[in-house]
Amino acid sequence: MLTLLAILAVSYLIGSIPTGIMAGKMLKGIDIRKFGSGNAGGTNAFRVLGWKTGLTVTLIDIIKGVVAAVSVVAFFRHHPIDVFPDINEVALRLLAGMSAVVGHVFTVFAGFKGGKGVSTAAGMLIGIAPVSMLMVIGIFLLTIYLSRYVSVASMLAAVAFPLIIAIRKYIFELGSGLDYYIKLFGEQLSFHDSLDYHLMIFGLIVALGILYTHRANIRRLLSGTENRVTFGKHS
């Protein structure tokens, strides 16, 4: 039990690193939560700080999710405080990743008011189901390119994930996942692309959560007042 609590606590603290707020303070001396949508995540960083900074914030927030779902779990597997949790591996990684997402949304370092959790959740899923997430990222980027709405891209990508898992698992009959091997700098590396049913259930819950946290964006989209990303105007 102590090991599980440690995994969740460390993952929460990693997720709590307020990337967007730190970028705003360091680059412009502002709290980005007082501008734009009032959010501390990557979407508002794009809007307030420009696309380059917004992209950097988003990538770091993604890395937080990957680290929680992969590295934190792996560390405590090799260095348990007591008995390592007897939990399905994918379910455990999801718990760690979600703890990081909670940290991102309710960051202890910034008054428990952070981002929406999209990028950190994406990072968690990249660590667990990288091939499926490559498809989701493709949908995300294409939607931004065509619509210039980061919020629309985030919501569409969230809905696409459980659908992609279901299609690959049941229509293409890929079972619980596939193992991939790549050669890098003369070394053979392997990674597992999971299609565990826990991912579908989780994906549906996340999609609903993302839609809920974007309800203000949906209202702005319907009223025609949602801001678009314009590439090249900010540095």
UniProtKB/Swiss-Prot annotation:
Pathway(s) this gene product operates in, as recorded in its UniProt entry: Lipid metabolism; phospholipid metabolism
EC number of this enzyme: 2.3.1.275
Principal location class: membrane
Residues spanning the membrane: 4-24, 56-76, 94-114, 124-144, 152-172, 191-211
Alphabetical list of InterPro entries matching this protein: G3P_acylTferase_PlsY (IPR003811)
Record's catalysed reaction(s): an acyl phosphate + sn-glycerol 3-phosphate = a 1-acyl-sn-glycero-3-phosphate + phosphate
Listed GO CC annotations: plasma membrane
Example GO BP: phospholipid biosynthetic process
Molecular functions per Gene Ontology: acyl-phosphate glycerol-3-phosphate acyltransferase activity
Cellular localization per UniProt: Cell inner membrane
Keywords assigned: Cell inner membrane, Cell membrane, Lipid biosynthesis, Lipid metabolism, Membrane, Phospholipid biosynthesis, Phospholipid metabolism, Transferase, Transmembrane, Transmembrane helix
Membrane topology type: Multi-pass membrane protein
Function: Catalyzes the transfer of an acyl group from acyl-phosphate (acyl-PO(4)) to glycerol-3-phosphate (G3P) to form lysophosphatidic acid (LPA). This enzyme utilizes acyl-phosphate as fatty acyl donor, but not acyl-CoA or acyl-ACP.
PANTHER family in alphabetical order: GLYCEROL-3-PHOSPHATE ACYLTRANSFERASE-RELATED, INNER MEMBRANE PROTEIN YGIH
Similarity comment text for this entry: Belongs to the PlsY family.
Assembly: Probably interacts with PlsX.
Protein name: Glycerol-3-phosphate acyltransferase
Organism: Chlorobium limicola (strain DSM 245 / NBRC 103803 / 6330)
Lineage: Bacteria, Pseudomonadati, Chlorobiota, Chlorobiia, Chlorobiales
Chain's gene name: plsY
